[in-house]
Amino acid sequence: MPAANQASPVQPDYVVSAVGMVSPVGANATQTFTSVRANLSRKRECPQVFECRAEDPDSEPAEPLVASAIGHLTTSERDQEQPARWLAFLAAHAFSDLWENASFSTEPNQSIGLYCSLPKDRPAFGVSNQPEFLSRFHDLVGKDAFAVEHFEFGHSGTALGLCEMARAHLREGRIRHAIVGGADSYLFSQWLNPLDENYRIKSTRNLDGFCPGETAAFLLLEEESQARQRGLVPWATLAGASKTNRVASIAGHDAGEALANAIKPLLSDQASSPLLLCDLNGERDRFKGWGYALSRLRTRLTPPVALEHPAMVLGDVGAATGAVLIALGVRFLHTKYRERDHALIWCASDSGERNALLLRRHTSPTGGPFDLSGGNPCP
């Protein structure tokens, strides 16, 4: 049986008022969303980064890595021996995009909290690299320390959990604005080697694998009144969050039970199912887990089920995934999926954590249609 559900209902009083991103398919959130919506990817061979093992090394040459790599930014920061500098570079670009969209002017740093997910379980990278990351990040964005700066080394769903921490700090009055996000890149040879060795990376030798990617994304959480004071119309309201942990059975998996238990508390009896955004990345086990979970949820999800898995375009973006899904999800609710009132985001991390978060599409106080022509949406 899976671990006891740790659902924590969230009162719908904090909104997503701005987002920022940088990715292989966009220099900002708007470009990235446009590319993801159109299924336009930039996956390419990257032999200078890594070469995957051949099925028969004695008779076949190594195969160039196919990855979703950022090529529109200067690569001078991409030092194979200093991944923290590159991650800080990506984070700074996404942060700057958010800052511009948030319409901040003279907002003091002491009213802002920064929450960032960084990769865990990577060779020669961890908590000891946080000072280097933070120093470089502050230099690049040109800002001093914020009131709260919390960095968590985790996996695809970590940023969803950070939204809960940020919400708590907002309610406690420690901050007025919470900037939550993540940055990750698999494109370092010392990180790719063990993944390739263990048949995780997609190649001719291993068709059941994922395409490595790199991205950074941030979102701004605050009270609606704070956003409107700066002339912004919020994208969505944070409406709920849930978390469970997988406990493997004798068969080696939990048949999707933990994931289903993370999602169930966030599903209502409304006529239409929410838009689903997830971290499916091409690996068979993750797809099987979702298939099992879907069968358990069949009475709670009203057809047709709408599912978006951006890794098809961006590749697997690791610890940045949760923030990426939120940043894309709020836009999907106002464009491609306007008939859906909610977006449910779920992540199934390698560590066994199953995170889910619910967003409610924002409407004006009068209940009228969302104005796409002005304010924050679709800048």
Map each language-model feature to its residues.
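Acyl-CoA/ACP chain-elongation machinery
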Residues: 176-196, 243-252, 278-291, 305-341, ...
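Predominant activation on well-ordered alpha-helical scaffold segments within soluble catalytic domains
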Residues: 33, 92, 96, 131-135, ...
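Condensing-enzyme catalytic core mediating Claisen C-C bond formation in acyl metabolism
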Residues: 9-23, 29-67, 74-75, 197-270, ...
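Active-site pocket-shaping loop/turn-to-helix segments
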Residues: 73-96, 150-161, 204-217, 240-268, ...
